[in-house]
Amino acid sequence: MSVKQLADDIASLSNDLVGDAEKQGSGNQAAGRRARVASGKIAKLCKEFRKASLAA
């Protein structure tokens, strides 16, 4: 996966995370779970991004 694609995926998941975190603040527990899942995916993508950026 290219650095550009990884950056786009991270940005998209970050937007989802922010939206779900706001919903969780309003008491939506399902949104809290989605936010936690998104944060895990972001962490994995950040590791891949770091490797890809060093290889580029």
Q: In which residue ranges do the predicted regions lie?
A:
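N-terminal intrinsically disordered, cationic/polar leader segments
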Residues: 1-19, 25-26, 39-45, 50-56
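Short, charged, amphipathic alpha-helical segments
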Residues: 32-37
